[in-house]
A protein has these predicted regions:
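Charged, glycine-rich active-site and insertion segments that engage polyanionic ligands
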Residues: 1-52, 60-61, 68-69, 165-168, ...
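Clamp-loader machinery-focused feature within the broader ASCE/P-loop NTPase space
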Residues: 2-151
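Conserved adenine-binding aromatic site and its adjacent loop/helix in ATP-hydrolyzing domains
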Residues: 126, 158, 185
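Conserved catalytic/switch belt of AAA+ P-loop NTPases
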Residues: 129, 154-168
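Loop/turn-to-beta-strand initiation segments
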Residues: 134-139, 164-170
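Residues immediately C-terminal
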Residues: 147-148, 162, 178
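Short N-terminal helix/helix-N-cap motif within the alpha/beta-hydrolase-1
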Residues: 150-153, 337
Length: 340
């Protein structure tokens, strides 16, 4: 099999990501922080930037997708690329873990971490000091960067500021405000570009969504196309989304019980947000106005919003998910039925 046939054909990036990749490749800098809310493509852009830096025949638009380096990135064996991710996310995205970590997980000594562990950061420091395997540079890709705790982040500081030899960094974050200021100050910042609605809808259609469904789910995701696609892949139907607010007001627990507790709370927060927006004379963001009940008071909705934020902090390990859904919907009804 030839090198070319073994490699992927260059994928078509969404236009808003391709424009950003071209801009970043034209600029200098050994460390970039890609920041913005979820659903705008930080992971995709970060990986494409790393791939292009490592490519043997890059263009102004990015990597060639034909060389040995590009193929090695595809199959997760590029020796000059090190990814720092929470173990749970690395497994989900098919990135290999180090031998000891994998053995610990296989032996069920512990569960995959949801944070970037300090041991991984120490391994990265050692990686940065190693000789390159053959390319022009080495690359460290950290995602989501906000999953580093203070100990992990502090382990990176000196290497991030003064990397030994040719080593470049790309940090991608969906909550950059949670990063240590010292981490942010050592990076050049790039704020992710929001696509236009028409760009996002066209992209969602290329992913297989009918236009009508794409429009509803894009709204449900607050205009973030990758989040909209995640909602579709999770099984959310446009028709179900439209009837959710009034179903919750009726006390229909089944309207949210198919979701995880985290997802259910996020949905209720969107209902609460839009109802508060209407109370303030603004346009709703996540639902059509006709799909929202005329319900609640400014005081009751504000308190409900605070209660939902409290619930979000403790929802990952409910004693009984069914009882939690019932409590969430009952609390919603209390807020929605309040009178002036």
């Amino acid at each position: 099999m030839t090198e070319t046939t073994a490699s992927q054909v260059r994928p078509v990036l969404s236009p808003w990501l391709q424009d950003q990749l071209t801009q970043l490749l034209a600029r200098r800098g050994h460390a970039w922080l890609l920041q913005g809310p979820s659903g705008l493509g930080q992971y995709t852009l970060g990986l494409e930037l790393a791939r292009a830096w490592l490519c043997e025949a890059p263009t102004q638009q990015g990597a060639c997708y034909q060389c040995r380096s590009c193929h090695a990135v595809d199959v997760r064996t590029q020796a000059d690329l090190r990814t720092l991710m929470p173990e749970a996310l690395a497994l989900e995205l098919n990135w290999p873990l180090d031998e000891k970590t994998q053995k610990d997980l296989d032996d069920k000594k512990r569960k995959p971490s949801k944070e970037i562990r300090v041991e991984a950061a120490r391994d990265m420091v050692a990686f940065s000091q190693q000789t390159r395997s053959g390319g022009a540079t080495k690359v460290v890709f950290i995602y989501p960067a906000e999953r580093m705790n203070h100990v992990t982040a502090n382990t990176l500081l000196k290497t991030l500021e003064e990397p030994p030899g040719e080593c470049r960094f790309v940090l991608a974050s969906e909550a950059a405000h949670q990063l240590l200021p010292t981490i942010r100050s050592r990076c050049q910042n790039h704020t992710m570009t929001w696509p236009t609605e028409s760009q996002a809808l066209r992209w969602l259609q290329t992913q297989g969504l009918p236009l009508a469904d794409a429009a509803v789910l894009l709204r449900a995701a607050g205009g973030r196309p990758e989040d909209a696609l995640d909602l579709a892949n999770a099984g959310l139907k446009a028709a179900h989304w439209a009837v959710l607010p009034k179903a919750v007001m009726r006390g229909d627990v089944g309207a949210v019980s198919d979701a995880t507790p985290t997802q259910a709370i996020a949905t209720l927060q969107k209902i609460c947000h839009d109802l508060l927006a209407l109370r303030m004379g603004a346009e709703p963001r996540f639902f059509m106005g006709a799909d929202l009940p005329t319900a609640g008071t400014t005081v009751s909705l504000t308190q409900w919003s605070k209660d939902l934020m409290d619930a979000a902090r403790t929802c990952e390990h409910p004693y009984n998910a069914g009882l939690m859904f019932e409590a969430l919907v009952a609390r919603a009804q209390t807020a929605l039925r309040a009178k002036e």
